[in-house]
Amino acid sequence: MQQQALSTKQFDAVCLQAASLSDEIEAGRRLPAEFARQLAAQGMFSMFVPRDLGGHELSPVDGMARLEKLAQYDAASAWVCMIGATAALGSAFIKADIAQPMFAAENRITCGIFAPNGRGYRDGDDYVVSGRWAWASGSANADYIGLGCLLTENPDDDPKTAEMRLVMAPRELIQFHDTWHTLGLKGTSSGDVELSQARIPVAHSYAIGKDLPWHDGPLYQMPYFAFLAAGVGAVALGNARAAIEDFKRFVGVKKGAGERRTLAEKSGVQSQLAQAEVTLRATRLLYRDTLAGIWQDVCAGVEMTPEKRADLRLVSTHAVRQSVAVVRIIHDLAGGTSVYLSSPIQRRLRDAETMTQHMIASASTYELVGRVMLGGYHETMQL
């Protein structure tokens, strides 16, 4: 049965709740379990699950807009939903009768890590898998976690013959390590997870970029890695917007030491704020225009060439890295107020800086895209 569509009123209420819980989320280094299930009930983890399974099958444009807005209220909540929702694209690549309870059961939460840190081999109808993965965002509340693995047919096969697949591991098979003590995105429970000789049914796995979806909707023709990058970009843009709005709320009353004028009355502050604003708006426009163009092409059946996939990776990384530049300006303008852990602007900066360290939005993306622009594409590129 298809989940009820999330109304604007319901979504606004979820956003306000995220804001009210932001300090608790930060201190606890995870989303409270009850709140995570509320997000799931409102469809934040099933945005990109096929309607045939009970998901919402939102367009990338609509889904990323929701993540961007949620990030304005609490970046950690948006990050967890982003990782979970993009990981749930796998629901269209696993047989429907298996995927439905895995991805679309009531209040289901999933997350995923595509880094192929697992090793395993086939034993009958199962893969036997061991490995350890970092950055397992949302793992504190996840029912299933997609884990990247290099898998062979036999234990002694040459590793060069291994196939990269994501295995959907149920929570009860996973060992959780409390490693997420970080600069930012503290509330995302992105600690390490581990499997040790775990048996995962072959039917509970899929290969990104190789397996064909059982669902013929255009959403499942979107390039996975570029789609993930777009998700990170959406969260970064929302976080940067919130930093500007946070600053505008207090700049009219704050005065520097020994000064009569408020920060809002200073021409230098006015100029830098305007520059931050136009930087963010221009970056967001490029991001949304490119995402909408890619989606339009996918819906029209246009081939997703390496150049098109690289373009979405490029503008998404640009969104992340320009967003942190904007937040740095705001943090600097806020002065001494922003050094305190209680400062929302400081949290925005710490969260923004941490987003830049995710490999999908790192500076190495520019090298990757430049290589494609110069005709150097090869199939192992994560586009």
Task: Briefly describe each language-model feature range.
Residues 132-173:
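DPxDG-like acidic metal-binding loop motif
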Residues 238, 274-281, 313, 317-324, ...:
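Generic structural signal for well-ordered, non-transmembrane alpha-helical segments
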Residues 112-113, 149, 169-182:
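Active-site glycine-rich loop that binds ribose-phosphate moieties when present
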Residues 88-125:
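Well-ordered mid-protein domain cores that form the structural environment of catalytic cofactors
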